[in-house]
């Protein structure tokens, strides 16, 4: 990177980002997932959050609907409202936290413009199975035909590489043509402050050329102009860097097994670095407050449109995990769980 011409390294470029960087990422995706992307299919963005805003700016008309599966990252609602859209929630299936496809099919209307999926999932750590993705895609294809509309599937993928036990994370453009992928390097390379990511818009998407051009302009008009130039060049040098998930996996198993032994109920996470735990009392916010007495910080499930649960993050040191377990034991005892 030091060998780059400074006026290029720190200068303006196409709103879509440096072409050589986009081509390098496209080739990496093609090797990994058997896709056929080129530089033109990628828009470099200021992280995934900005990428989602670019996508909604590009596709949403006022009053159109975006469907999301609870629990979900609550800022999705703000992103949709930024462009006068309406968020439609699908209630969770708390037995598996796979998408509730029956309710999903019932809530698709002629106003439905997009559906957001996030896998590996925040806050549950669940990975949507290939069977789930195929069924979801089939429903969308049938509804597009029924209503004569285009419905985009927005795949928010900041945790893609963080998967355990050999679990495969399906690449959604291979299952549904009208997919837009939003990716961030914040989690995979631990670069959240650098704000770098991208959108993928495949050629197979309806009106792809116009969609790609509109997304590049949207990148500018929402105020980003372009993704940070320096970190774009850095990313191009490490697109095939592999994430060492061993430390996360060690923490995952220690925390999950430790809490289960104490009597807590939780789904075993397959990806990301979160554990979604059922609160032993109806008011999970009170449970979170009680945890603070033992230096345990939890996020209430109502912050993800799923009350009655709490989210724990295990992206900390192994010592922190192990030192927390006796404190969780005290918390379990306070709430009458098996200790």
Where are the language model's segments positioned?
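PLP-dependent class I/II
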Residues: 1-5, 13-16, 20-339
